[in-house]
Structures are given as structure tokens and as C-alpha cells.
Regions:
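The feature marks the mature, well-folded catalytic cores of soluble enzymes
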Residues: 1-317
């Protein structure tokens, strides 16, 4: 018995204790991933290329879309979006469902929220999207991304309702798509990581926090007045952000001009066809790359909605 207790299996000679944190293991034991800001250089994204699930949708309202889509044109625009990421040096991964998924799987950002230690899996608020999170969870596991939590119980949470202000602070919103129980689960996990969580409420008629507030740099944010939560703007200003407000509401509504993805400090990828807003961004020192997205917009989402952020350069502030 003594000889057995001295073996490595029982903690004896040769035992190798695991002393690194999960965060330290990412990129070695686990796949490369992690996010703690909305503006640092973008490294990897998760997309879903629209497939046969978009064919023949005669009643878009039944799928919470705005108008019928030309599926072929939507695919071409999505392919151009993916290529724009590759051209910017971003690694593009695809969800790759094994069977035809629900039509809204294209909006991957809603299905996950990335932290420095791995992903939180969402629980979409509508029955139309129920189960989409399974495909994203499976793909994240394939990529070696740690899954820290899946929203459970009667909680609902969509990834577009959480944003990083800085590595120490995150916003989590409640509203149409995220309820109090779901927000509390996300906030609890983030607080375990030492992150300060500022919970805000969204007004009626707003889909997600992402649609009201975007970050262009460590000290520059763009917001939609009368939609963005007051507490969110106050939190940003308290942390020395300049908060600019969109110049043209028509472009924000119909062109999804605020629904951009930040490629790096003051570099964004935005939808084409928004000349007033693009000029406004450029005047603020933001470099804008544009892609056509008007067909995908008919599904009630834009570039930000379609992009699951897997990895940004991690900041050690």
C-alpha cells in the first residue's frame, strides 16, 4: 500500500500539479480566445454563412425579420463581410451546423459573450431562436474555447446586451432580449472575475444594447441619443471617454450605421450607404472600411449582430 501511495497517481513522485489559472492556459491548453475591450485589435471572429434556411421565407414576421430576403444576395454580402475580415488580418471561423438551422443563426453575436477566460453561452429570448445557442456552443468547444456558463433556468440573455467598457468594467443591459435573471447570471460570473458590472435598462423599442452604443477606441464611444441608457453614458464619461452622438437617425435606422465592428483603435468595419455617418466618423479620426449589407439588414441585423467576437488583443491595464 505504501508503494502505491508514493506513485504519481496518488500524489507521490512524478505528480504534476496544475498551478496556472484558466486565463494563463488559454492559447496552450485551450484554444486562442478572449476579449476584455470592445476596441483593441480584432484577432478572430465566428460567423454563420447563411444557407438553405433563408430560402422561401414567405412571412418574414414569423421569423422576426423586416422583409423577405434574396438568399443568394445575402450570401454574397456575407461572403464579402468575411473577406473584409480576412483582409484586415482577422481569422474567420464558421459555425458549420450539421443540419439546416433556424434562419436567425446568421446573427452569431446574440448567442455568446466572450470574456478573457472564455465564453458565456446565451439563451435567446424568443422561441423563434430557441436552440440556436447549441450550434454555437458545439463550435466553440471544437475550437477549444472554454465555456464558462450557459444561461439557465428562466433566464434569457443575448450577447449583444453586454459590452466591455474597459478590462475592469462591463455593461449588462436588461430589456426585450435579456431579463433580470439572465443578466444576474452574467453579472455574477463577471464579478467572480473581478469585473465591475454596471447594469442598465433599455427603453421600449430597443432590441439590444449593441444597437445604442459602440466603441471606436479606448477613449471614444458613439451613442444613439434617446436610446442609449443614461447610466451607460455617465459610466463612460466617468472613465474619461468622449461620447459622440450619431448625426443622422435615418441612417442609423435604415442603414444600421451604428452597427459596426471595431477592427482596432479608430478602425471600424461599417455598412455601406451611410455617407453622413461615415463622414462624421472620419471627422472624428476613425478609419472606415465599408461593405454592402442592405440585404442582410432585411433580417433585422447588421455587421455587429452577424459577428461573434472570439478574440481581441488582451489588455493588461
Amino acid at each position: 500500500m505504501t508503494d502505491i501511495l508514493n506513485t504519481a497517481a496518488y500524489g507521490g513522485e512524478g505528480w504534476s500539479p496544475r498551478t496556472q489559472s484558466l486565463r494563463e492556459e488559454i492559447g496552450r491548453v485551450w484554444g486562442k480566445c478572449g476579449v476584455d475591450t470592445e476596441w483593441s485589435p480584432l484577432k478572430a471572429v465566428l460567423l454563420h454563412r447563411p444557407g438553405p434556411e433563408l430560402e422561401g421565407l414567405t412571412d418574414p414576421r414569423a421569423f422576426q425579420m423586416l422583409a423577405p430576403l434574396d438568399a443568394g444576395r445575402a450570401r454574397k454580402q456575407h461572403d464579402a463581410l468575411a473577406q473584409a475580415y480576412r483582409d484586415a488580418g482577422v481569422t474567420v471561423h464558421y459555425v458549420k451546423p450539421s443540419k439546416t438551422p433556424p434562419p436567425n443563426l446568421i446573427f452569431v453575436a446574440d448567442l455568446m459573450f466572450m470574456t478573457p477566460e472564455g465564453a458565456i453561452i446565451a439563451r435567446p429570448a424568443s422561441t423563434v431562436r430557441a436552440g440556436e445557442e447549441r450550434w454555437v456552443a458545439r463550435r466553440l468547444a471544437d475550437l477549444g474555447v472554454p465555456i464558462l456558463h450557459s444561461v439557465r433556468g428562466k433566464g434569457t440573455f443575448e450577447g449583444a446586451d453586454a459590452l466591455w467598457i474597459d478590462p475592469q468594467t462591463a455593461l449588462v443591459a436588461t430589456g426585450l432580449r435579456t431579463n433580470a435573471e439572465g443578466a444576474a447570471q452574467v453579472a455574477s460570473l463577471l464579478r467572480e472575475m473581478g469585473v465591475e458590472v454596471i447594469q442598465v435598462g433599455l427603453p421600449y423599442g430597443v432590441m439590444h444594447l449593441m444597437g445604442t452604443l459602440r466603441f471606436a477606441d479606448r477613449d471614444l464611444a458613439i451613442a444613439w441619443p434617446r436610446r442609449v441608457p443614461y447610466a451607460a453614458v455617465e459610466a463612460l464619461r466617468a472613465r474619461r471617454y468622449t461620447v459622440l452622438f450619431i448625426p443622422d437617425e435615418e441612417e442609423a435606422i435604415y442603414g444600421m450605421a451604428l452597427n459596426f465592428v471595431t477592427l482596432g483603435p479608430r478602425r471600424i468595419l461599417m455598412a455601406a450607404g451611410n455617407p453622413i455617418t461615415q463622414a462624421f466618423y472620419e471627422e472624428a479620426g476613425i478609419t472606415c472600411q465599408v461593405v454592402e449589407m442592405d440585404e442582410i439588414h432585411k433580417a433585422a441585423g447588421g455587421i455587429g449582430c452577424a459577428t461573434g467576437i472570439l478574440e481581441r488583443e488582451i489588455n493588461n491595464q
